[in-house]
Amino acid sequence: PAICVIINVQVVKEIDVLIDYLEYLVQLKPKSDRTILIQNDQHTKEGFLYEQEVKKYMATAIEEDLFEVYYQPLYDLKEKRYRTMEALSRLRHPSLGMISPEVFIGIAEKHGQIAKLGYLQFRKVCKFIKEHPQIMEKIESIKYNLSPLELLKSGYSKKLLRTIEEFDIPFSYFQFEITETVATEYSEA
């Protein structure tokens, strides 16, 4: 398929921003073999600027460990009890508010920040388990999401296992799930 994008270059002054904008436009394309038309309209520009702002904030958020972990309990209808919790990463931007995990995880994967972000979050989960042993008496495990890019990083899995040992937590407390963002791309390749 052919992609044609027309951009008013007077709006984009720096080549790096132009390249980022073109990459942003290409990621908007639908997956089909037909001709692709991507609107270069105000809505698209606002989406691009939003992502650029989040991208700028990511380095600070990782460096200062500003990500939060929310725990979502999962209820078993048959057993009539909570069996597990899912650890979910969240990011609050000072002016944009809550950033969708789909946005910040995609940016972290694209810019090589996902392993550092994931490890910071994993340590928080281990600390939470260690500080709240009464919770683990009531549930069986905590689900933790991993990006395929984390798993492909040499030594990363061993680092997670060492962290579990460091906090003296049974390995059985964890269920690891692979996120869909990059996993989908691998399955389509």
Q: Over which residues does each language-model region extend?
A:
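Conserved helix-loop-beta segment at the catalytic/binding core of cyclic-nucleotide signaling proteins
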Residues: P1
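Conserved beta-strand termini and adjacent loop/short-helix elements that scaffold enzyme active sites
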Residues: I7, I38-D41, Q72, T179
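Catalytic core of bacterial c-di-GMP phosphodiesterases, primarily the EAL and HD-GYP domains
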Residues: I7-I15, R81-E86, Q113-A189
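C-di-GMP signaling machinery
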Residues: V12-E68, A108-G112, E150-S157
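Nucleotide second-messenger and two-component phosphorelay signaling modules
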Residues: K31-S32, T60, E64, D76-K78, ...
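Active-site core of bacterial EAL-family cyclic-dinucleotide phosphodiesterase domains
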Residues: H43-I107, N145
